[in-house]
Curated annotation (Swiss-Prot):
One of its GO terms (biological process) is mitochondrial translation. Residues 1-21 are annotated as: Disordered. Residues 1-17 have a biased composition (Basic residues). This is Large ribosomal subunit protein uL16c. CDD domains: Ribosomal_L16_L10e (cd01433). The keyword Ribonucleoprotein applies. Part of the 50S ribosomal subunit. NCBIfam families: rplP_bact (TIGR01164). Its main location: plastid. Keywords: Plastid, Ribonucleoprotein, Ribosomal protein. Belongs to the universal ribosomal protein uL16 family. GO terms for cellular component: mitochondrial large ribosomal subunit; plastid.
Length: 137
């Protein structure tokens, strides 16, 4: 599972997911991509599940780039705990995704193979996504 090696602070505020993604919304590395259409927190487990699904479906050949990284810790308090006594301990890591963000990119395979592999990865995501492709490469 993906997680940062070292962080400045152990806990973070939840924050808001306002507006569209201003960075990471263009295809940069591959020819095909999976683009988010809704805002969400995507966990490191979901990212890994999508990556595995794409790798299995692309079979041999093809290169995959994961364009998001889970750098936000999510804390959870133990069950049946009274209020107070500080914030809970970090349990898992999430990536904050806004609409327009590219989640995965792929190259080295045909369009229909990429569409099938990315479609299976999309079903692992908790949000609506779309398959996009670059005309340039």
């Amino acid at each position: 599972m993906l997680s940062p090696k070292k962080t400045r602070f152990r806990r973070q505020h939840r924050g808001r997911m306002k507006g569209l993604s201003s960075r990471g919304n263009q295809i940069c590395f591959g020819k095909y991509g999976l683009q988010a259409l809704e805002p969400a927190w995507i966990t490191s487990r979901q990212i890994e599940a999508g990556r595995r699904a794409m790798t299995r479906n692309a079979r041999r050949g093809g290169k995959i780039w994961v364009r998001i990284f889970p750098d936000k810790p999510v804390t959870i308090r133990p069950a049946e705990t009274r209020m107070g006594s500080g914030k809970g301990s970090p349990e898992f890591w999430v990536s904050v995704v806004k609409p327009g963000r590219i989640l995965y990119e792929m190259d080295g395979v045909t369009k229909n193979v990429a569409k099938r592999a990315i479609g299976i990865a999309a079903s692992k995501m908790p949000i609506r996504t779309q398959f996009i492709f670059s005309e340039i490469k």
